[in-house]
């Protein structure tokens, strides 16, 4: 079990738990983790998937991009547990629950 946590942004302190996959976005109908108050987040912005013991972060062709370590995420990249990343203008991280 993993925990997706908002570190800074309009929903600071909000968390979502997930086991295999979670979609991040601004639209409640399309996203498991809804960042509806961040207007820089696309309706369906990014996805986190558990692949064995690794986490994969995928930008879903969002308008304003996803950043990891200051770099734009292109396609599917590994996400270390605890490493912060940015979706729109919201800072997030994944930890083990």
What is the role of each PLM region?
Residues 14-90:
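Forkhead-associated
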Residues 1-6, 12-13, 53, 88-97:
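Regulatory inter-domain linker segments that are low-complexity and enriched
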